[in-house]
Amino acid sequence: ARKMAARKSLWKAQTGEAFLCSPEGVFPDKKMRQAAYKNLTEAEKYIREAVPFKESVTSFDYNADGHNEYLCSMEKYTACISARGGQITELNVIHNLENYADNLSRIEKFDKVNDNYERGLFVEHVFSKEEFSDYKKGLPSGCGVFSKALFREAEFNGTKKEIKLKGEGTYSNLDIPISLRKRYLINSNGFMVQYILKNEGPIAFSGNFVVESNFAQTDFSNADKNSYKLDLISDGNGISYETADEPVVKKDISFVQITDTSSNISFVYEPNEEAGISCQPLLFKRPDLNSETPQIAENTFTASLFWEFDLAGGMEIEKTINFTIITPKKRRTKKI
């Protein structure tokens, strides 16, 4: 019975509705795409209930783009990590069957700015002071070197559930060579992500190292509604934003909890040393069948941890983030 139910969910996901332009507008298109992910994850859930489930991390070129992806099939979620940007391009939470990495990117024709990179989770940038000032305002600021980089595999161990990637690029108009080593250690509840940013050249430089994550809209009751709640610990003091509808920038952050109020699922970030944070909702527009004027197609909540740094030639800095998915049944409480 479970296998039959799983097959029906797969059929629903494969009907092709997610690829059609609805006469109802572009926002319902997003809802249909999320429904397709939901049906796929539901099929996965049925199969897990029918046969013994074993957590795994595998490496294969699943989308036939010439580069391996890493598929993490864990107790609370499934995730796909791409070599492009070294980022999480799918994050399907088993509890509510949603894909939290299903985000658009801004296109100048419709959104008046170009992002020039894909908006997943754990997307890294290196910005100058001026670029970072624009970034915090949601303005065009370039791709930040690593968000468009093709990361290569340094080491993969499926048994240890460990992925090591390395990205390379150049910084500023001086073309300073820099590299970023990125280590994912995958567990049942989330990830530990370790970074080593290195100045590969002889010239010292300073900047901001930014780790960006984008959370897709799951509440479709209102196109421009932000359904995420934000809780922070800044310099030992708790700060809460019931709906973070405006940009938020804070420093001395040791704890971040982003909660999807439509499902009560939380995502917790705990950096190994205090960081800054920049958060804001972003609206994406696309044309629909009934109007040449772009309409709201999606609302994404963007949260970025950042650190200022100075790097002499040949030197490096290390940062680590623990990322935990908390479902309603087992919620960790922390005084804030």
Q: Where are the regions a protein language model picked out?
A:
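Histidine-centered catalytic/metal-binding microenvironments
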Residues: 1-91, 95-122
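Short acidic/polar mixed-charge low-complexity motifs
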Residues: 75-77, 87, 174-178, 203, ...
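Short, isolated positions in well-ordered beta-strands
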Residues: 77-80, 248, 317
